[in-house]
């Protein structure tokens, strides 16, 4: 089974390969700079848009495209950054720029620590149609970055039941509790049907 990943984010590619125990091909290796307009109103809609766009562009009925749309939501900030997590500080912004924009938004509001959650929506496009699964991780965000591990908003997110940020936790712990890991476990069940 040829599995194409609808991402060029190196951190996400590595994480998905490790969790799925399979090699994936980043879509840009096959399609270059294919334009994908993520104009959905939810993580699920954006994951479907990415998976379907890439699957259709490949023209290979035997290919399987896995797309993930994920992000962090902070209810007290009106659910920011939500579906805009990857471009919170602007289109083309780095993980660090997005992280510090959220930290600064908390500081502007005088918030040191508040509930937040990560969502991962995964869409799988194949000759069988499109399947979707979700995973969530609950916790809190803090107004500072702690730790060097992980990527994205990890240095400011403390998962429920822990006193360290994802940026401070060992990779194995993060993998066992993450929103993406939960969604990928469900995605594996779908993929096993086709083996």
Swiss-Prot record:
Enzyme Commission number(s) from the entry: 3.6.1.66
Q: Which residues form the active site?
A: 69
Tell me the InterPro entries matching this sequence: dITP/XTP_pyrophosphatase, ITPase-like_fam, RdgB/HAM1
Which cellular component, as a GO term, is one annotated location?
cytosol
Q: Which reaction is catalysed here?
A: XTP + H2O = XMP + diphosphate + H(+); dITP + H2O = dIMP + diphosphate + H(+); ITP + H2O = IMP + diphosphate + H(+)
User: Which prosthetic group or cofactor does it need?
Assistant: Mg(2+)
| Record keywords | Hydrolase, Magnesium, Metal-binding, Nucleotide metabolism, Nucleotide-binding
The name this protein goes by in its record = dITP/XTP pyrophosphatase
Q: Which organism is it from?
A: Nitratiruptor sp. (strain SB155-2)
């Amino acid at each position: 089974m040829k599995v194409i990943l609808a991402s060029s984010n190196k951190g996400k590619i590595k994480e998905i390969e490790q969790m799925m125990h399979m090699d994936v091909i980043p879509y840009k290796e096959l399609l270059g700079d294919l334009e994908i307009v993520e104009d959905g109103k939810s993580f699920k809609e954006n994951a479907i848009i990415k998976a379907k766009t890439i699957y259709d562009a490949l023209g290979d009925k035997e290919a399987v495209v896995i797309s993930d749309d994920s992000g962090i939501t902070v209810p007290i900030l009106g659910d920011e950054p939500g579906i805009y997590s990857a471009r919170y500080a602007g289109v083309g912004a780095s993980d660090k720029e997005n992280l510090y924009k959220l930290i600064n938004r908390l500081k502007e509001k005088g918030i040191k620590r508040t509930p937040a959650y990560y969502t991962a929506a995964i869409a799988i496009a194949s000759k069988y149609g499109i399947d979707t699964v979700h995973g969530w991780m609950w916790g809190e965000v803090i107004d500072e970055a702690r730790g060097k591990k992980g990527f994205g908003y990890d240095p400011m997110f403390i998962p429920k039941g822990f006193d360290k940020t994802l940026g401070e936790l060992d990779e194995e712990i993060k993998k066992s509790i993450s929103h993406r890991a939960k969604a990928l476990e469900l995605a594996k069940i779908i993929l096993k049907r086709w083996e």
